Design a protein with these regions (language model features):
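Surface-exposed loop/interface segments of Gram-negative outer-membrane beta-barrel transport/assembly proteins
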Residues: 154-155, 160, 171, 229-312, ...
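Short, small/polar-rich motifs associated with maturation and membrane association
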Residues: 1-366, 373, 378-380
Length: 557
């Protein structure tokens, strides 16, 4: 069922970027620049749509069969908090002159979404999110108020608990524009469990560069994680599951020919003396016709083989994809006394893709301690660790694209159960044996990431208007990437210049064996910051205020 509509404010102005969700699910869309939306939902009753946008009251609308829904959203008159966090300071919102947007993490949680950057879509004005790949676990590209290449890329700066965090792999200019590589490795917060986040502040104007320099040319996203509270221990368990349906030939949007229709088309093209492209792989009906004209088979054999092709109806989607179930678990405990407060959590994510064999496993751990050592001295410690493994097929294999573009008349298996190969053209001179199942079984891309981050802080309260802050952070990240092609694959045959099992020519670059590429990155960073903060109110009814900070910071990576 398709539902369309428009979202406006009380002044009848359209609202782009509004998140529209089917209540109780992760199924949703975002309104376009005209404020319009178009969402397809399964048959269910009742149908309740949830509309949300930063600065507006969340609204629920029950669908009763309207042809076009009109939703008017009202402004949220209450502020999230009386303060905002910039990473260096906590500022009274009433005194704020910068463009800063603040949201609570609990307000943007979407079931089944395991990345906080994806949850920000439609919730932060001037923030644009794009994904260049449909693969599981890929990192979207974030853009805040346009783009800049002043610092070599266009990504915003991430700050967690006052510390700038870097990507797990420092990228050079050769790979910055490679979406297959950049999207898969994850960004600076890929190892952070969204369930551990308390709030998010987004800095978008010159105030960001004042604090962080040229690194903030593309904006700053400040994340504050959860802390302990005074009281008895509170244990929480959160679990989300998602279901991803694989493509099927019966889907309305997949209008592809069956084997009989494809062979009939080939007959029409042959009767019209159609000239095929020189780089086309000759397979199926065209291959049999070529064999017939060459005298390799007779008319009777030709008719028998064509009949087999008409009855193949290979279900490539069933062979290469599967319905996928994913799940996410977080167990946390928090509590404490006036002197010591704590928050700790462990998390596990298993995110499976519809492409068989693709998926992500991730483990996270978090510990936060806060202690009032004296009336004038407070100490805190935040520790975060993560381990993840990502398994993908080689991007050159392209299972989903292959299923969409390959004739169903082509068989995946021989009658005896062995793989069925055809000659795939490499260039005008060479053709080698190809079967996509052989490519998948003998190639892979595997990425393993791990790391930990430790932040310690001392806060000195000299007076009620003057305090000092000393912060130390140490972080380690490891990234291992492995790409493999076996010697029996078409990919290696093109390098070897011969089919598997056939002697390679003397000028072959790879006469035997396969291809293995490994990239290992180890990154260690530390930073030390000392800061003095002044926030003094004076005068009648404390109408006047002096606010400032003086600090020194050093870092290394």
């Amino acid at each position: 069922r398709k539902i369309t509509g428009i979202v406006m404010d009380t002044r009848k102005q359209s609202l782009p970027g509004v998140t529209v969700l089917l209540k109780g699910t992760a199924l949703g869309v975002v309104t376009d620049k005209e404020g319009r939306f178009n969402i397809e939902i399964p048959e269910t009753d009742p149908i309740v749509l949830v509309f949300s946008f930063v600065g507006m009251k969340k609204q629920e609308v029950t669908y009763t069969g309207q042809e076009d829904i009109q939703v008017v959203m009202e402004e949220e008159v209450t502020e999230m908090d009386e303060v905002v966090i910039t990473g260096y300071q906590v500022i009274d919102r009433k005194k704020l002159t910068s463009a800063i947007t603040s949201v609570k993490a609990e307000d943007i949680m979407i079931p089944g979404v395991n990345s906080i950057d994806q949850m920000l879509e439609g919730r932060i004005p001037d923030l644009m999110l794009t994904t260049n790949s449909g693969e599981v676990g890929v990192v979207p590209r974030l853009r805040i108020r346009g783009t800049s290449t002043l610092v070599g890329n266009r990504e915003p700066l991430w700050v967690v608990n006052g510390v700038v965090v870097n990507d797990p792999v420092p990228l050079d200019s050769d790979v910055l524009n490679d979406p297959d590589y950049v999207n898969r490795i994850g960004n600076a917060i890929a190892g952070l469990n969204p369930q551990d986040i308390q709030r998010i502040d987004v800095l978008k104007d010159a105030a960001a560069t004042t604090l962080y320099g040229t690194r903030a040319a593309n904006g700053v996203i400040v994340i504050t994680t959860k802390k302990g509270h005074v009281g008895k221990p509170v244990v929480r368990y959160n679990m989300t599951t998602t279901y991803k349906r694989r493509p099927r030939y019966s889907d309305r949007k997949i209008d592809l020919m069956n084997s009989k229709e494809r062979i009939d088309l080939s007959r029409e093209l042959a009767a019209a003396s159609y000239l095929y492209p020189s780089d086309m792989s000759i397979v199926g009906y065209e291959y049999l016709l070529q064999q017939l004209y060459a005298g390799v088979i007779d008319d009777e054999q030709f008719a028998i083989e064509v009949k087999k092709l008409e009855n193949n109806n290979t279900d490539w989607f069933d062979i290469l994809t599967e319905d996928a179930f994913s799940h996410n678990h977080t167990l946390s405990i928090s509590g404490g006394t006036d002197q010591l407060r704590y928050y700790s959590s462990v998390g596990y994510t298993k995110d499976n893709d519809v492409i068989k064999g693709q998926g992500i496993s991730r483990y996270t751990g978090n510990l936060s301690l806060e202690s009032d050592l004296t009336k004038w001295l407070k100490a805190s410690m935040d520790f975060n660790a993560n381990i993840s493994e990502r398994n993908y097929e080689q991007s050159a294999v392209g299972s989903v694209n292959y299923a969409y573009t390959t004739s169903r008349a082509i068989a995946a298996y021989e009658e005896g159960g062995d793989l069925s190969y055809y000659q795939k053209r490499y260039n005008s001179f060479y053709r080698y044996d190809f079967n996509i199942l052989n490519e998948r079984a003998n190639s892979y891309t595997k990425q393993e990431n791990s790391g930990f981050d430790l932040t310690s802080r001392l806060v000195f309260r000299f007076t009620d208007w003057l305090n000092g802050d000393v912060l130390f952070n140490y972080a380690v990240s490891n990234a291992d990437n492995e790409d493999y092609w076996g010697e029996s694959t078409y990919h290696v045959a093109c390098i070897r210049k011969s089919n598997y099992g056939v002697a390679a020519p003397s000028d072959s670059e790879l006469p035997y064996g396969g291809e293995l590429s490994e990239q290992n990155t180890r990154n260690k960073t530390y930073s030390l910051r000392a800061q003095l903060n002044l926030n003094k109110y004076f005068g009648e009814e404390e109408k006047h205020n002096i606010n400032g900070a003086l600090g020194y910071e050093m870092s290394s990576s």
